[in-house]
Regions:
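Bacterial N-terminal signal peptides that target proteins for export
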Residues: 1-7
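Gram-negative bacterial Sec-dependent N-terminal signal peptides
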Residues: 8-12
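C-terminal motif of bacterial Sec signal peptides marking the signal peptidase cleavage site
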Residues: 14-17
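Zn2+-dependent metallopeptidase catalytic domains
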Residues: 19-230
Length: 230
């Protein structure tokens, strides 16, 4: 699994519905979301409250509750978490305030907290303690992770804010760490194709989805061979 430097986005490898009350998507950047004048209505995903990833746990540093997590929890939790992060990112990209380091870069750092919680556990399980159901989940999620990543890195409005900050970086009064974060973030967006034409971005999306699926299958084959020869 490969993590981008500046925010929790997964771009590589990666199911128990219960009748409890669902948890509604909540934004970790609610202050930004409230200021967004262009919020686009979408169907709200829900996550059953019986899913261990639906809420914070009592363990230190939100350590995974492996005794409660089952294979069937991952896909709904991951889909919910991606929708949650997309809502957070859209709020940042669509806000009317001029871009600042705080309302753009710092806000981006705060997105996808649930996604990271679920994805790290999922990645560890698929790499070290997998089974047939996890493999199916991994194959299902791989192109969705790729699409989620592209929705962020190919977001024109989001990149415009980052690009504006980058071009004015000498006047922002940033410390060395903040400056480095801005530079790396800008570089990551460029490498992901943020300045490509709309047509080329569509080609990139298709290639990324294919690479993600192939990489997932390749990783599964390697793990299978290692296990069979152990």
């Amino acid at each position: 699994m490969h993590l981008k430097r500046f925010l929790p986005v997964i771009i590589a490898s990666f199911f128990f519905g219960c009748a409890s009350a669902p948890v509604q998507t909540q934004s970790a950047t609610s202050d930004v979301a409230q200021s967004s004048a262009e919020a686009q209505p979408e169907q709200e995903l829900t996550l059953d409250s019986s899913n261990p990833f639906a809420h914070d746990n009592t363990l230190p540093y939100q350590a995974p509750e492996y005794d409660k997590i089952r294979t069937e929890h991952f896909v709904p939790a991951l889909k919910f978490a991606m929708a949650e992060q997309k809502k957070e990112i859209d709020a940042i990209a669509n806000q009317t305030e001029a871009p600042t380091f705080e309302n753009t870069l710092v806000a981006m750092q705060k997105t996808g907290q649930r996604f990271m919680r679920v994805a790290y556990v999922f990645d560890n399980m698929t790499n070290a303690y997998t089974n047939d159901e996890l493999k199916k989940a991994e194959e299902e999620m791989a192109p969705l992770f790729s699409a989620h990543n592209d929705e962020i890195y190919l977001n024109d409005k989001l990149f415009a804010r980052i690009d504006a900050l980058y071009n004015d970086r000498a006047n922002l009064g940033l410390d060395s760490e903040s400056m480095r974060l801005l530079e790396l973030t800008h570089e990551d967006f460029l490498r992901a194709g943020a300045k490509l034409s709309a047509a080329d971005k569509e080609k990139i999306k298709q290639m990324n989805a294919e690479i993600s699926s192939i990489s997932t299958k390749f990783g599964q084959n390697i793990l299978s061979e290692m296990n069979s020869s152990a």
